[in-house]
Amino acid sequence: MAVLQVLHIPDERLRKVAEPVKEVNAEIQRIVDDMFDTMYAEEGIGLAATQVDIHQRIIVIDVSENREERLVLINPELLEKDGETGIEEGCLSIPEQRALVPRAEKVKIRALDRDGKPFELEADGLLAICIQHEMDHLVGKLFIDYLSPLKQQRIRQKVEKLDRLRSRA
């Protein structure tokens, strides 16, 4: 198990479209485990492989209070979405920044689990929002892409300043 480095904007690798996982094997399972370690270490609720410079369609999520409800989505597909909602979202790749993002209230997805078994899931609330957020990462999209150009620029400047301060520390 390992904690991986999370990419931050403006790193262009965050914009790369992830490739489907061809086979769920021990290497993919190790990536999943490392992604959970990374997500928990960074105090996140979701992480897409793209964020750790692995360009495969893998997502890990745990929105539970006790951090014991791991959800693995390999090659996720959005089947249905319904309603409208939105919360102030944050992102491990855009540290300490939040913004209101419009999302579907409910989603239905199909994916493979950690063992490569197919399943379908209907989700609402925070889980539905998190799934949509992480699936965006797999196609190179970030939550700031939903914002005005001015807000995007302000957030980028704040993150770049934060990264400069951290690199000096």
Curated annotation (Swiss-Prot):
SUPFAM superfamilies: Peptide deformylase. Fe cation binds at C91, H133, H137. Its EC number is 3.5.1.88. Gene3D superfamilies: Peptide deformylase. It is an enzyme of class 3 (hydrolase). The active site is at E134. It comes from the Bacteria. One of its GO terms (molecular function) is metal ion binding. GO terms for biological process: co-translational protein modification; translation. Keywords: Hydrolase, Iron, Metal-binding, Protein biosynthesis. CDD domains: Pep_deformylase (cd00487). PANTHER family: PEPTIDE DEFORMYLASE (PTHR10458:SF21). Removes the formyl group from the N-terminal Met of newly synthesized proteins. Requires at least a dipeptide for an efficient rate of reaction. N-terminal L-methionine is a prerequisite for activity but the enzyme has broad specificity at other positions. Belongs to the polypeptide deformylase family. This is Peptide deformylase.
